Amino acid sequence: MAKEDVIEVEGKVVDTLPNAMFKVELENGATILAHVSGKIRMHYIRILPGDRVTVELSPYDLTKGRITYRFIK
């Protein structure tokens, strides 16, 4: 997947799931399943329910995404 093909949206973490997966509610009200990107995992950035995050979505499957940024409160 090329970097230009991704869709970036903001959302709020609703629930924490096993294996660094999260349920994220997007701005438009849709709920998706998202995993943590490698850089966030590498720098031990903790993501908790209620955090605002940026999610990258693939145009091929809009129900799964990758968390690329956690906003500072």
Curated annotation (Swiss-Prot):
Keyword Repressor on entry: no
Domain S1-like: 1-72
Keywords of the record: Cytoplasm, Initiation factor, Protein biosynthesis, RNA-binding, rRNA-binding
SUPFAM superfamilies for the chain: Nucleic acid-binding proteins
NCBIfam families according to UniProt: infA
Oligomeric and partner information: Component of the 30S ribosomal translation pre-initiation complex which assembles on the 30S ribosome in the order IF-2 and IF-3, IF-1 and N-formylmethionyl-tRNA(fMet); mRNA recruitment can occur at any time during PIC assembly.
Name of the molecule in the record: Translation initiation factor IF-1
Originating gene: infA
